[in-house]
Structure formats: C-alpha cells, structure tokens
Regions:
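Bacterial Sec signal peptide processing site at the extreme N-terminus
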Residues: 19-38
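TPR/TPR-like (Sel1-like) alpha-helical repeat modules
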Residues: 55, 111-138, 166-170
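Flexible helix-coil transition and linker loops at the boundaries of alpha-helical arrays
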Residues: 57-66, 136-143
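Terminal, low-structured helical/coil segments at or just beyond the last alpha-helical repeat
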Residues: 138-211
C-alpha cells in the first residue's frame, strides 16, 4: 500500500506540473490556487478577483487532477457567491460546454437558475449535480479502495448529506432555502475534498515511515 500511495503522490505531482507549467497556464494556476483559498476563508470578493484574473489569462486552464475544474467553473461559482446571478449563469453554462463532467459547475448552475426563479429547471440540475458527485465519490472509494481512495470522504460526510437532500427532493414540498443552503455546503465540502484526502494520505505515509 505504501508503494501505491507514494506512486499516486508522484503521479499527482507530475500531472500538476504538466498542467500548470505551460506559458500563461502557470499564472492561471497560481490565481486559481489563491482564489480557492480565499473562497474557503469566505472571502468571496477576493476569490472573484483571482478567478477573473485566471480566466482572463487562460480561460481553458484546468485545475487539479481529480475533479479537473476549469477557470470558468471557478469564476461562475464566485459570481454566484457574490450574488451576480446573471453573469454566473452565463459563465457556468460555458464551463459545462467545455467540460460536461464538471459536477460542481452543474450543481452551482442549478442553484443559480433556481435563485433566478426557474425552480423546476434549477432543481433538475441540482439533483443531477448531487447524484454525479455521489457517484464520483463512490467510484473513488471503491475502485481505489486499497490505495488513495480510502482517503476520500471516509466518513461519508459528503455522501450522507447528499442522500438526505435527494430524499427530501423526492418527497417534494420541501423548504427551498434549506435545500439551497445544504447544496452550497455540500459543494464547498466537495471542492475541499481533494485537499483533505491528500493531507490524510500524506499523514498516513508519514506514520508508515515512522514505524
């Protein structure tokens, strides 16, 4: 297992270098990284500035090796978090046109559309986004269970709330403000999960080395 974990970390490093060290992409990658940290701190205005800069530098840049999210995805989410719903909708639609597998862009698009008043269309995207996130986590934890997959959502802190919200949607007649709040929390936790998983993996490797 130790060899597999070490190999995974090396692969992540090589891929990160590959995707971020090509011309303008290097600057875009730095802006996205700083924007993510600002977003995690709750500094949505600061995050928006970083993601705008990243999109202007390289609108096709892809961040990360697991979730693989584009600069437009991050920009659209920051616009949503800053209450800029019309620009967010346009940006998130472009992000999904680039990468249909961007589950967070899909979830945030649903939230945006719902908050604009089209709850039926918004709900469809919210539900679809949640299901895709759950399926992705299940894939990671089962396919790679003996290596890095064990560090992804180990206590199902993301998947359990997803199931709860999907059940609520299926029953109908739910509180929209609660669904939106829950969805935003799920989205933020999922965005942070690669960082959390990598940190847990590194801690486990350090423990194994010290034995």
């Amino acid at each position: 297992m130790n060899i597999a974990l070490r190999g995974y970390s090396v692969a992540l490093l090589l891929l990160a270098v590959f995707f971020s060290a090509c011309g303008p992409s290097f600057q875009a990658g730095g802006d996205v990284a700083q924007g993510r940290q600002a977003m995690f701190r709750g500094d949505n205005q600061g995050a928006l500035g970083y993601f705008q800069a990243a999109a202007q530098t390289d609108s096709n840049y892809i961040y990360g090796t697991e979730l693989r999210e584009g600069t437009l995805s991050y920009l659209g989410r920051a616009q949503y978090l800053n209450g800029q719903l019309a620009p967010a909708r346009d940006t998130l639609q472009k992000a999904l046109a680039q990468h249909k597998s961007d589950n967070l862009a899909r979830l945030y698009l649903g939230l945006t559309v719902a908050r604009q008043g089209d709850r039926q269309s918004g709900l469809r995207e919210i539900e679809n986004g949640m299901k895709r996130i759950r399926d992705f986590l299940n894939y990671m934890t089962t396919t790679f269970a003996m290596s890095f997959g064990q560090f992804w959502d180990p206590a199902q802190a993301i998947r359990k709330p997803i199931d709860t919200n999907l059940t609520m949607i299926a029953r109908g007649n739910f509180d929209w403000s609660m669904l939106i709040s829950n969805s935003e929390t799920i989205a933020m936790n999922f965005e942070q999960e690669p960082d959390n998983a990598r940190q847990q993996e590194e801690q486990q490797m350090e423990m194994n080395r010290s034995r």
